[in-house]
From Swiss-Prot:
Designated name of the protein: Protein GREB1
Stated family: Belongs to the GREB1 family.
Chain intervals with Low complexity compositional bias: 292-303, 1134-1146, 1224-1235
Record keywords: Membrane, Transmembrane, Transmembrane helix
Transmembrane parts of this sequence: 1873-1893
Keyword Disulfide bond found: no
GO cellular component: membrane
Coiled coil: none
Compartment(s) of residence: Membrane
Main subcellular location of this protein, as a coarse class: membrane
KW Lyase (keyword) present: no
PANTHER family named among the record's database cross-references: GREB1-RELATED, PROTEIN GREB1
Length: 1954
């Protein structure tokens, strides 16, 4: 008896097994023991991992193993522990000898492990958190494949050292497991134990025990256990990946599946790696599956198959169907019985993109006598029968197991369909019964009966049938659940009686009776074994030759049935069995057949079909006979009658011009959508992306390991200009620089990616965009790499790189996945938020063209629509004659893979077609019409263009070995036919570049005007115009774009058995095309795109534009010679064609007729292209006639190029060549028209010159040839209106969550389709997203990850490159601000004085010199352009020197600004939150939001006449700036430094910033501006805005103004700041005087800064010398800290009252900075001495010009104002808040009339509409725009200004004012020589007296304006000042502001001077 370890089984071992078998049978309820020999192996089920594999041990279900063979109805037995020996230890975690066995206790202790033993961890129910360490003989553990664990047990106690435990029961008692269930090693030995790098023993992978046996349909508890890779020979470094089977080792091969000795003559293809069916929610009969998230098991596209392979040894004949085959879809499984051919035992893991769906095995319990599979079954039946296990028990199979395939997938489908839908469970729908087994089977029979002979059953169809049946039978209940709240009520009685088991065989037979024996029903009396034996007998006898499906039913028992379905149809069985092979197995299978010579029989067969013997002999004979003639004949036939020549005399193609480069509207729209999504991430409250912290953009594009795709992407990057725009490179950009931004994901990628990560870490202010192009490729989890990195280091590379922790956590990396097939990234576990998906927009909406495009995209949906429309020849076709021959050969050669047969047949067809076109007409019988058409047009296309432009034929051969065979064969035939220079054959493989012959390289360089001698084409796009056959290999396209000269897309060899949506659509995406929008399609649908085009039918990833730099021209002005052929019929396939490549009309041409009318072919091909319109028939006097030749003609052997050539490319829907008067335009075709003959004789047929194939290709999409199976799949629709292909499993790496899912809808948008897949699919365990939800977070989306999806070849590369450009522009814009850039005003009025500050090099002002300088009254700040000029002496100012007053509507007209890049010393708003200033802002993630306390600060103010209470909000972090009575007590004062303090890291002056309406946009973040220096910054806010400011600036000190100032202007804030600071100065002087500090030593300065100050600059002046006034200067940005430290260090600084700086302007004149200091007005950013200005107050009522008013008050008080001219401040333009916060509106709520400034005042007691605005604001605004009404003589009369006493009010730019102060000892200008045109008395106080006013002189008629708080004060002022003596008053000259009485209006009184 053989086993897998030793040659013979020892007798003692045999006796032990026999004993266990007897014991198990005694415990069982049945009398049938398990076969002894099958017990010698515990056939491990390699299922997907259960939850216990995910470290949960609390949900373990009772498992069955070989010791307990319970039958289905047997309940689990309770286990009674024997009493322990007296005196022994019974403590949990210790053995009976008292030794500690817990892993945590002995992990570091040395443990002796005997040879052949392994340390494992046992789980005890009483110690759920601990593992007990045991030593177990590894023979009794599963082997490397999870198989072949010997039954029984042998273990040692590692605690006390006791050895020789032979029974696990005894051992479990010794280690005190204290079990309540039967002691089974499968149940309790859970983990391998391994030592980590520190040598400590740790928990390793799960032990991969087999799952429980199927316990019956009424009492099944578990169908699988944890799947695990067993340990290697070494006990260390085990990689734990408990969710995957071992790829490549074929765990699906059951016992007996290994090659049965060396006698087998071919490798079996019965390995189960095909698509699995189980997609949904698990059946309630499998609770552990539900718990362990194993509902996501692989789903089949065709009915999946599990092979029944043989046992490991030939002698071991038994096979138990419960030995399951399970492979995950993410792996390639090794050939199950190919051990002799594959010597290595290391599994080979494939590229993730190359894997196919896999079969997941469910329990298939065997019972009864075994069934022997007859010998020679495959030879007799011509196909391997595929048996689907259905319901109930399944018998053992033995014998010739290589010739049969068994699958449990139908069983899985049945189980899924018996589970209720989740949608109804939540309504309490448990009362609704699932569909019965009898109904399931009957519906299956109905489904099989209606299948056509060429159809293959699909599990999706069956699932939908079950779902519809269940819904219809429970329609009433479903409606009740949907319409009413859940209520407990009985189920409605179904009107249809249920099918009973007794009725089932008869009903099934009745259903099958109408299908001509396609379905055969076998009824069994006792077991399925009878039916299977009967079926095998009928197969051997040939009685099932017409039967495709055999249904075997055993309904002998009371309530249950047994069933299975065998697929015996040769076509169906072959497809289903081959669909199990993964891509790698498929390639290995083909390679094996090629290297072993099995395909030689095909060649012999083809030779026998050739009438003249072997085809090679015929080729050699033809070559010898025609040597030297073929080339000349083709050359002669290709000469052109007329051709446009360039300057050098070389023919030029005028019909075709190259596409202009540029970003198309669609691409720009997508780029903007991408940018919008990035901005939304940044704007979200999660702060996952801080766009404000980035200064530039960098990127890396990751692509699959395809050399062509790599070069193609590099080309796009190189020529897009993105590197220049991002500032990453400078002109000229080289290709090598572009290559640095494209990463090919191959074995060398890791090092480059590490450098990318390092770069991102080192440049935190650069935003890195990581673009994952073709993102559906390689989704394998990195855990697979961790286990099998030695076999294939590229496995899981995408996951290892793009999902690594560094990428996920880097705050400056945004990941963008780009794909045409997003389905595998749209699962329940995806990392990408649905809000971060960007879908390609639709082009039409409600008939409106949303994006005007010059070209229309022609994708898969358009191909399908054009084919279904029927109004023209189809673009999608299948070749029925080819399919028929493949089917026939499949029957003749059943042991050859169909891909081999299909490839050899197609190559044979191409070879025969080339021979037929070249002069061997008899070979037309050995090809198909389709292949002949392709070949003929390929050869003729260069002859239609003067330059030799031709078409491309794409021949898709996925299998690389077959592609090499095809290339060699076609190249050989081409060489024997002397066609090497007529078209090229190119073998394209992802791992290699493009090889093109020298002749064709020369042509390409000529067409593209390339001078580089070393140039070679590197992308398929550069092959545009080259006549060629591109043999495109590789299991999946990797994003390669194809040129516009692609005319035929031959997909007849794609692997049609692997039916998943992604695989199909990416193959068909190769044909995606752009056609000209302005030229109507000659065939195809209307130019309307489906709404769901962007989401349904997508494929490869690259743009359609950007081919080559050269200008490809096409078109012809010459005639084309060739025979006229009638067109083939309109059929979609060649079988219906009456031509069939045989007898057809032709014209006899001799060599004498082939008279050249132009340069020979060789010269034509060298003609360079030129741009020009298409021109046809330009030769004068040309006669164009049509004649159809009708009879057969003799073919001239000396003119092989002029043989009859069927032209089926004339697809205009008309028989144009059959009508003599048909217009010539009907002759044009899209890929090479029929050759016509043009000779200069009158009686010879002449046709119009054909157009260049390149020009025609621009307006016609390619023609696609498909396998019949795929063709039917695409053109048949389901109930949703979509092609059936749309309902397939979306990707092999995902699986459905439930069978109870709706179909996709045709009306679904891209977003809706994404949500559909997110709801109904989950990733397989091998998928990189599988473990995403295991992190325990509900929202596991990555915040900086986006997904761009769009159809193939539509321009996604161009879109995301454009996105990078506009993202960079936006970041630059974010780092730029619009600052006011205005020149100083009134410079011509500057006071000229002999006293100027001449010490140009002084860093600080000299006090004595400065005091001698006069004060400049003129306002130079450009923001006061509309303000009144201040006169200091009589001036003669022309009226035109002052601007015209702005209109009221121009109040906020945009001022001149400049865009400036923010420096590192800028002030920021709330949108900036970089890492450096997070703590400063109070938003640091490691800190709680800043806690603040509210403090009251009260002081008395004489100006207000009452005590003022101000509130301080002080964050805890800023309390050190203040003095409190006690910690947390009363606020006493704000700390002030000393004048004598010297510190370079501390700013002495507290900064106060009044602000309103700018909580988001105010520039309050001074961290960078202060360069990190310690400073005190206080925001001064109004009470009603306190909360919002505190929210945005939680770590800032707030000074809250009293509520009475809520409607006040900035004057009130300035007034209270100054009053507060003076009061605080007094308090600090008192406090520090107690500490011995002199009062004058306390720092008296504060800073009052505008909230829009953004940056500060210093002018560096280079003085040439004292004598010379010439100097040079430059300006640079500096920190505010630098400026403050410099100013605060000024000598005698306390003698200055006000200090300030210039306003920045780009056009600052040298004279403005030449003098370092000026005595003039200061604005915006002032340093105020609150001590010196104690008696000078701000006017708390003012809204505008309060700083000018204050400056004049300070100067008149005799104080010094100093402006540092070499410092300047930049002010940002902020469009919100500030003075814009004040709106003047009517108090009448329904008034819609606009309020103009003239309405701001009214007569007292009038019925004027009152306004809702402060009286002071109305006054100031009225005077600004309408002061001429009060001062008519002052208008433009600058020599006679208005005298303004104690105030400055803006009277508009047309009126000048003269300011004087009434205070005693004040400094005023001399007014003795001045005559004033008006007098303004504003709220004058007691200092203004009648005697004071009498000093001034006024013009006759001058006007007076007195303004007071009320009418009484107005009259009192007139009397007190004796104004009536000189001024005439009238009652009508009294006014008030337009306020209601409660708003306290201001009153005016005007008068005229007498």
């Amino acid at each position: 008896m053989g086993n897998s370890y030793a040659g013979q089984l020892k007798s003692t071992r045999f006796e032990e097994v026999l004993h266990n078998s007897i014991e198990a049978s005694l415990r069982s309820n049945t009398l049938v023991p398990r076969p002894i020999f099958s017990q010698l192996y515990l056939e491990a089920e390699q299922q997907l991992s259960s939850l216990e594999g995910g470290s949960r041990a609390d949900n373990e279900e009772e498992e069955e193993d070989g010791e307990g063979g319970l039958e289905p109805s047997s309940p689990p037995n309770a286990y009674q522990l024997p009493p322990p020996p007296e005196g022994c230890c019974t403590t949990d975690g210790f053995c009976q000898a008292g030794k500690d066995l817990r892993l945590v206790s002995i992990s570091s202790e040395p443990i002796e492990v005997p040879a052949g033993f392994l340390l494992v961890g046992a789980k005890s129910p009483s110690l759920p958190d601990h593992l007990l360490v045991c030593a177990v003989d590894k023979r009794f553990l599963p082997d490397d494949n999870g198989h072949n664990a010997l039954l029984g047990f042998s273990g040692n106690c590692v605690g006390c050292g006791k050895k020789g435990f032979c029974y696990f029961t005894e051992f479990s008692n010794h280690i005190n497991l204290k079990l309540t269930t039967q002691p089974k090693k499968q149940k309790h030995l859970k983990y391998y134990l391994v030592r980590n790098a520190q040598g400590a023993l740790t928990k390793g992978p799960l032990i991969c025990w087999k799952g429980s046996e199927f316990r019956g349909r009424q009492n099944s508890t578990n169908t699988c256990s944890s799947s695990l890779f067993p340990p290697l020979e070494s006990s260390g470094s085990l990689a734990a990946f408990p969710t995957e089977p071992v790829p490549g080792t074929n765990p699906s091969v059951p016992v007996g599946a290994q090659q049965a000795g060396p006698a087998s003559d071919h490798p079996s293809v019965t390995t189960a790696t095909g698509p699995a069916v189980f997609n949904g929610k698990d059946s309630p009969k499998h609770p552990q599956l539900v718990k362990s998230s194993l509902s996501a098991l692989p789903r089949p596209s065709a009915l999946g198959i599990l092979p029944n392979s043989g046992p490991p040894k030939k002698r071991h004949k038994g096979w138990s169907p419960e030995s399951k085959s399970t492979t995950d879809g993410g792996f390639i499984q090794g050939g199950g019985n190919r051990a002799k051919h594959e010597g290595t035992s290391i599994p080979c893991v494939p590229q993730a993109g190359l894997v196919g769906p896999a079969s997941v095995t469910f329990p298939v319990v065997a019972s009864g006598e075994p069934v022997s599979v007859p010998d020679n079954l495959l030879k007799i039946c011509k196909a391997k029968p595929v048996i689907f296990k259905g319901h109930g028990n399944f018998p053992y199979l033995c014998g010739n197991l290589n010739d049969v395939v068994v699958s449990p997938l139908l069983y899985t489908c049945y189980q899924n369909s018996q589970s209720l839908a989740r949608a109804y469970e939540q309504h309490g729908a448990s009362t609704m019964q699932p569909i019965s087994e009898e109904t399931q089977l009957l519906l299956t029979v109905y489904y099989l009966v209606q299948l056509a002979a060429d159809q293959v059953p699909l599990m999706e169809d069956l699932e939908q049938i079950f779902l519809r049946s269940w819904r219809e039978s429970h329609l009433t209940e479903i409606r009740q659940y949907q319409q009413a709240p859940p209520q407990p009520f009985p189920p409605a009685t179904s009107t249809a009686a249920p099918v009973t088991s007794a009725q089932l065989p008869w009903l099934a037979g009745l259903a099958a009776s109408s299908c001509n024996d396609s379905v055969h029903v076998i009824e069994c009396a006792y077991s399925l074994a009878e039916g299977l034996s009967e079926m095998f007998r009928l197969l051997i006898e040939g009685k099932l030759s017409k039967t495709n499906y055999v249904v075997i039913i055993c309904a002998c028992r009371n309530a249950a049935i047994d069933s299975c379905i065998a697929v015996t149809g040769k076509y169906q069985a072959r497809i289903l069995s081959e669909s199990l092979l993964s891509p790698a197995e498929y390639q290995r299978e083909v390679h094996y057949e090629l290297v072993t010579g099995k395909v030689d029989s095909l060649g012999t067969f083809f030779s026998s079909l050739c009438p003249e013997g072997d085809i090679d002999i015929l080729l050699d004979k033809f070559h010898q006979e025609n040597q030297g003639h073929v080339s000349s004949s083709f050359t002669a036939s290709s000469t052109k009658k007329t051709a446009v020549l360039d300057a050098s005399g070389v023919p030029v193609c005028t019909s075709y011009h190259q596409e202009p480069r540029g970003v198309r509207p669609f691409q720009l729209a997508v780029a903007q959508k991408l940018l919008s999504h990035v901005c939304s991430i940044a704007d979200s409250s999660t702060q996952n992306l801080d766009l404000g912290s980035f200064e530039k953009v960098d990127f890396l594009i990751c692509i699959p390991p395809s050399e062509v795709t790599y070069q193609q992407t590099v080309f796009h990057v190189w020529h897009s200009g993105v590197l220049l725009e991002l500032g990453l490179e400078k002109e000229p950009v080289t290709k090598q620089r572009a290559e640095q931004h494209v990463l090919k994901l191959d074995t060398e990628a890791q090092a480059r990616f590490k450098a990318f990560l390092q770069n991102s870490f080192q440049n935190p202010h650069t935003l890195f965009v990581l673009i994952h192009d073709h993102a559906h490729w390689d989704l394998v989890s990195s855990a697979v790499h961790n286990i099998y990195s030695q076999s294939d280091p590229s496995v899981g590379l995408v996951d290892r790189l793009l999902n690594c922790r560094e990428v996920k956590e880097a705050p400056n990396i945004v990941t963008l996945h780009v794909t045409s097939f997003p389905y595998a990234l749209q699962t329940q576990h995806t990392l990408i938020s649905p809000y971060n998906e960007i879908h390609w927009p639709i082009s039409f909406s409600n008939g409106v063209d949303l994006y005007h495009e010059s070209k229309k995209y022609f994708g898969l949906s358009e191909f399908i629509d054009s084919t279904l429309s029927g109004h023209s020849l189809p673009l999608l076709r299948y070749d029925s004659s080819f399919e028929a021959m493949v089917t026939a050969l499949g029957k003749r050669f059943p042991r050859l893979h169909s891909a081999v047969i299909r490839t050899f047949v197609l190559v044979q067809h191409y070879a025969a077609a080339m021979m037929a076109v070249s002069g061997l007409p008899q070979m037309k019988n050995h090809t198909s019409v389709e292949t002949l058409e392709i070949t003929q047009n390929l050869l003729n296309s260069p002859k239609q263009c003067p330059c030799g432009h031709g078409l491309m034929v794409l021949l898709r051969v996925p299998c690389s070995p077959l592609a090499a065979v095809a290339y060699e064969r076609l190249a050989h035939v081409r060489a024997r036919l002397a066609l090497e220079e007529h078209f090229e054959i190119i073998l394209g493989h992802p791992s290699s570049g493009i090889t093109v012959g020298k002749h064709f390289v020369k042509q390409l360089k000529m067409w593209q005007k390339i001078e580089d001698a070393e140039w070679r084409p590197q992308t398929y796009l550069e092959l545009e115009g080259l006549p060629c056959i591109l043999i495109f290999s590789g299991m999946d396209p990797h994003g390669e774009s194809l040129p516009r000269s692609l005319r035929y897309c031959d997909l007849r060899l794609i692997n049609s058995s692997c039916l998943v949506r992604t695989a199909l659509e990416q193959e068909l995406g190769l044909a995606a095309y752009f056609v000209s929008n302005d030229i109507p399609l000659e065939k195809g649908p209307k130019n309307e795109a489906l709404e769901s085009d962007g989401e349904k039918l997508s494929s490869t990833d690259e743009d359609e534009e950007a081919g080559t730099e050269g200008c490809f021209e096409a078109g012809s002005t010459s005639e084309q010679r060739g025979p006229v052929k009638r067109e083939r019929s309109h059929s979609h396939d060649s079988a219906s064609s009456s031509l069939s490549s045989r007898a057809s009309g032709s014209v006899l041409y001799g060599e004498s007729l082939a008279q050249p009318s132009g340069p020979p072919q060789g010269e034509l091909t060298r003609s360079p292209p030129s741009c020009g319109p298409a021109e046809e028939g330009r030769a004068p006097g040309e006669i164009q006639r049509l004649r159809v030749s009708q009879g057969s003609t003799v073919i001239s052997r000396h003119s092989p190029g002029l043989v009859p050539q069927p032209d089926s490319s004339l697809r205009t829907g008309r028989r144009s060549l059959q009508v003599p008067a048909a217009p010539s335009s009907q002759l044009s075709s899209s890929s090479g028209s029929s050759s016509t003959c043009a000779v200069p004789t009158a009686n010879v047929l002449v046709l119009q010159a054909s157009q260049c194939s390149m020009a025609k290709a621009c307006r016609q999409p390619p023609i696609v040839f498909l396998p019949k199976l795929v063709y039917d799949m695409l053109l048949s629709t389901d109930s949703s209106g979509l092609p059936k292909s749309a309902s397939l499993l979306p990707s092999p790496s995902v699986m459905w969550t439930s069978s109870f899912r709706p179909l996709l809808s045709k009306m679904m948008t891209s977003t809706e389709q994404s949500l559909y897949y997110r709801q109904w699919t989950v990733p397989r365990p091998s998928h990189m997203d599988y473990g995403n939800r295991a992190e325990g977070r509900v929202d596991s989306f990555h915040p900086r990850r986006l997904l761009l999806s769009g159809p193939p070849q539509i321009g996604k590369t161009g879109a995301y490159l454009q996105f990078l450009s506009i993202l960079s522009r936006m970041l630059i814009r974010l780092t730029e601000v619009d600052v006011y850039d205005e020149e100083e005003i009134n410079t011509s009025f500057r006071e000229e004085s002999e006293w100027r500050y001449l010490q140009l090099a002084d860093p600080w002002p000299d006090l004595e010199l400065f005091q001698k300088m006069p004060f400049d009254y003129i306002i130079h700040d450009p923001k006061y352009e509309d303000a009144s000029l201040i006169c200091s002496h009589p001036q003669t100012i022309k009226s035109e020197d002052r601007g015209m007053s702005r209109k009221p509507e121009d109040l906020y007209v945009r001022r001149q600004t400049a865009r400036m890049r923010l420096s590192k010393y800028a002030a920021y708003n709330t949108y900036h939150h970089c890492e450096q200033c997070q703590q400063y802002m109070g938003f640091h993630p490691h800190y709680q939001l800043s806690e603040s306390t509210l403090h009251v600060f009260a002081f008395s103010c004489s100006m207000l006449g009452e005590e003022v209470q101000l509130h301080f909000i002080i964050p805890k972090s800023k309390e050190h700036h203040f003095v409190f009575s006690q910690p947390g007590g009363q606020l006493e004062s704000m700390r002030l430094p000393l004048v004598t303090d010297k510190s370079h890291e501390h700013i002495k002056s507290p900064t106060f910033t009044p602000t309103t309406g700018r909580h988001e946009h105010g520039l309050f973040n001074l961290y960078h501006a202060m360069d990190g220096a310690n400073h005190l910054h206080v925001l001064v806010v109004k009470e009603y805005e306190m909360a919002i400011y505190k929210k945005y600036w939680p770590n800032h000190i707030m000074l809250v103004l009293p509520s009475i100032f809520n409607s006040a202007g900035v004057g009130a804030a300035h007034f209270l700041i100054k009053e507060l600071c003076y009061h605080n100065l007094e308090l600090e002087r008192n406090r520090q005087e107690e500490l011995g500090v002199k009062p004058q030593d306390v720092w008296p300065f504060i800073v009052i800064a505008d909230d829009s100050c953004v940056m500060w600059n210093v002018a560096d002046v280079d003085c040439a010398g004292e004598r010379s006034r010439e100097f040079s200067w430059s300006e640079r940005n500096v920190s505010l800290k630098y400026i403050m430290l410099h100013i605060e260090a000024s000598p005698n600084i306390t003698h200055y009252a006000l200090l300030g700086m210039r306003k920045w302007a780009s056009k600052t004149r040298g004279r403005e900075v030449q003098e370092p200091f000026s005595r003039c007005h200061v604005h915006d950013f002032i340093i105020l001495n609150v001590d010196l200005t104690q008696n000078v107050q701000y006017n708390q009522n003012r809204f505008t010009c309060d700083d000018v008013d204050f400056n004049l008050r300070v100067h008149s008080a005799g104080l010094l104002l100093c402006r540092f001219n070499r410092f300047s401040v930049m002010k940002k333009q902020i469009a919100v808040g500030g003075h814009r916060s004040f709106h003047i509106t009517s108090k009448v709520s329904d008034s819609s009339v606009a309020i103009v400034p003239s309405q701001y005042i009214c007569a007292p007691d009038s019925k004027h509409t009152f306004l809702a605005a402060p009286a002071q604001l109305l006054l100031e605004k009225f005077l600004q725009y309408h002061s001429h009404r009060f001062f008519p003589l002052s208008l433009k009369n600058h020599s006679h200004p208005v005298l303004s006493v104690d105030c400055y009010l803006n009277l508009g730019p047309q009126i000048s004012v003269c300011y004087v102060s009434s205070r005693p000892h004040s400094l005023n200008i001399s007014c003795s020589d001045m005559v004033f045109s008006g007098l303004l008395l504003y709220l004058c106080d007691s200092f203004v007296g009648a005697s004071f006013l009498k000093k001034f002189h006024f013009l006759k008629g001058a006007t007076l304006c007195v303004i007071c708080q009320d009418r009484n004060s107005l009259r009192q002022t007139v009397v007190r000042l004796e104004l009536e003596d000189e001024w005439q008053f009238r009652l009508r000259d009294e006014f008030q502001t337009a306020n209601a009485k409660e708003d306290r209006p201001l009153f005016f009184l005007t008068a005229r001077h007498i």
